[in-house]
Amino acid sequence: MFPPVLFKKVKRNNKKRVVLRAAAILLIGSVLGFIAAGLWSLTWNDRVFTVRYELASDKVDSGFRVLLITDLHLREFGEGNSMLVARARDAAPDIICLGGDMIETYASYEQDEAFVSLVKRLVEIAPVYIGIGNHDAFAFYSWCARTDMEMTSFGGVTNLTRAVEEAGAVVLEKGFEDIEINGEKVRLGGFYPFAFRDEGDTDESWESRRVFLEDYCDTELFKLMISHRAVSFYREDAPDNWDIDLVVSGHTHNGVVALPGIGAIWENEGFFPKHSRGMFHEGKLNIVVCAGLDGHGCIPRVFNPPEIVVIDVKAK
C-alpha cells in the first residue's frame, strides 16, 4: 500500500491532467468553432448589407439622406448588379455618392458598359456623383501628376467619363458644385490626394491643392466631400485646417479580414486600425468610412460583410 503522501501526490497529478485535458479540448473546440464561424461568414459575401449613421448639423433644416457606395471593383451582386440597385432603391436616398474604385483601370469595353448601365439605374433613384479611387483613376482620367508614389492631380477625361456623364452622373475630382439636396443647399466636392503637405510635395504641387481646398471651404453652406481615402483628411494637420461637415470615404475594405466585435485586423493604417470602418470626428471634420463591397484580389472578406452606407444628415 502506497504511503498517504505519495497517494495524495498522484491524486493531485491526476487532477492536473484532467484540467489540462479539459483546457486543451476547450481550446481546440474554440479554434474549430471560430474557423467554422469564419467559413460561415463567407456566405455573407454574396449579399449587400446596409449600414446607417446619423449626423446632426446646424446648417440644415429638413435634412437629407446620402447613400455611399464604394469599392465595387467590377463585382456583380445579382445579374447586372440587380441586388445592389434594389438595396440602393430601398435606401430611398436624396443623393448617391460613388466613393471610388467602383471599376478598374484595366476594365474591358463590356465591363465599362456594365458600369454605365449601373450608373443609369442609380440615376433613376437619385442624383449620382462619382469620386475616383486609386484603382479607377485612369478609367476616368487619361493622365495624372505625381510626387513620388502619390497622385496629386488628374486631367484629360476619358470615354468612360463622358459616358457616365451622358447617363446623368457627375464625376468630381478636385472640383465642387453648389447643389440643392432635398431643399438644402450643399457644397459637394471630390478630392482624392492628400489634404496636407506630404514630404514628397513640391511647393507647386501643394499650393495647387491648398488653393482648391481653401476655395472649397470658403462657404457657409453644408460641405460634403467625396474622398476615396479617409487618410487624405485625418492625417497630419488636415483635420484642424479644413472645416468640412462630412467627408465620405472607402478604400480600406475594413481590412478584408476582421474580428467579431473588434474590426479589421490590419489595414495600411496598421494593426487594429481606428479608421477602417465607421463614423469619426477628427478636429473640424466628420468622416464616414464605408467598408465597401469587394474583397482584396483572391482574399475573401471574413467576418466583414459587403456594405453600402446610409447617412442621415439632420437638423441639430
Where are these regions (language model features)?
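N-terminal membrane-anchoring alpha-helices
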Residues: 1-60
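Mobile, glycine- and charge-enriched loop segments
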Residues: 45-78, 215-216, 221-224
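Beta-strand-turn-beta hairpins that frame and shape the catalytic cleft
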Residues: 56-67, 169-170, 176-188, 218-222, ...
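Membrane-embedded segments
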Residues: 62-170
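Active-site neighborhood of phospho(di)ester-bond hydrolases with catalytic His/Asp-centered motifs
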Residues: 68-70, 95-101, 127-134, 172-175, ...
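Solvent-exposed loop/turn segments at secondary-structure junctions
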Residues: 73-74, 102-105, 134-138, 177-179, ...
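Binuclear metal-dependent hydrolase catalytic cores centered on His/Asp/Glu-rich metal-binding motifs
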Residues: 143-169, 181-223, 233-234, 239, ...
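Conserved beta-sheet core of the metallophosphoesterase superfamily
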Residues: 230-309
